[in-house]
Amino acid sequence: MTLRRAARRAAISWIAIAISVVASIGGATALDYPTRPVRWVVGFAPGGANDIIARLIGARLSERLGQQFVIENKPGAGGNIGAESVINAEPDGYTVLLVNPSNFINTSLYANLQFNFPRDVAAVASFIRVPNVMTVGKGVEAKTAAEFIAYAKANPGKVNMASAGTGTSTHLSGEMFMAMAGIKMQHVPYRGAGPAVTDMLGGQVQVIFDSMPSIIPHIRSGALRALAVTTATRSSQLPDTPAVADTVPGYEASALFGMGAPKNTPKEIIEKLNKEINAVLAEPAVQKQLVELGGDPVIGTPEAFGTLIVSETEKWKKVIEDAGIPKVE
């Protein structure tokens, strides 16, 4: 009996030692992370807002953590190709995703997705909210959102609303505005914001809910006129322009960007990335560059960003369903 007790105690001691060693290794892994370059997937081509934001923050993370955050552009299917590649990657912290509005929208817009974004992506950190701007051409007499709503109600279906394409945030921002303001406009989708803005300048279409970086040069030049921004409050870039919510209470349709990782990425790694990203977002030089992109930093926990991912996905799902937008096969 004594030998059995001794053997049992020895076995328990070895198990305890093994658990302690594994725990210490796990802690060391998180503490030392990253020990090699991190692949940061951006689901769009180089040069756009997604790419610019990732490169800005990635450069500072590379400096702070001593390993390169290598931007890998994987465009296609509205960002779905890039998202799926990250979702299917090893959850070890060495593959991350630039999260953007298309990820929230596509969950309801695409019929045959092989993933559920809020379920299959681990939220790491939010970066920035960028407003769209409700903008009209010189031929539109309305000087405020309220005047525009009154005009649209008096002329149902006669106002043309441009967008960068069906299902984009520029389209759905307008659909939400129509639903909440009780008006009807004709949607005119374009292949990107560039040609849409060109026709705005030419007077072929009357209104667009375009992204701040794309539209603000034309507003500042006086070629187009801003009626309202789509964030819940005014933007520091257009401080004299009210929010849509000042006229349509509850309206909010900004573009949220952040970092995601494969589900089951170790919590310690996510928390370390979150801490470093928040430190980067607090740097005055980075804040200045983000403001120049038209947005304001959103500093928070992984849990807070996860909650935002769910709420944004649900918001756009309702807009898509209420507008009767057909799913992309």
Regions found by a protein language model. Give the residues of each.
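N-terminal secretory signal peptides that target proteins for export/translocation
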Residues: 1-8
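Sec-dependent N-terminal signal peptides
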Residues: 8-18
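N-terminal signal peptide c-region/cleavage motif recognized by signal peptidases
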Residues: 23-27
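N-terminal (or domain-start) structured segment
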Residues: 29-119, 158-160, 166, 182-211, ...
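An extracytoplasmic/periplasmic, membrane-proximal ligand-sensing/linker region
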Residues: 35-37, 179-181, 220, 267-329
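Hinge/capping helix and adjacent helix->loop/strand transition within the periplasmic-binding protein
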Residues: 88-94, 109-195, 244, 249, ...
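Anionic-ligand binding region
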Residues: 195-252
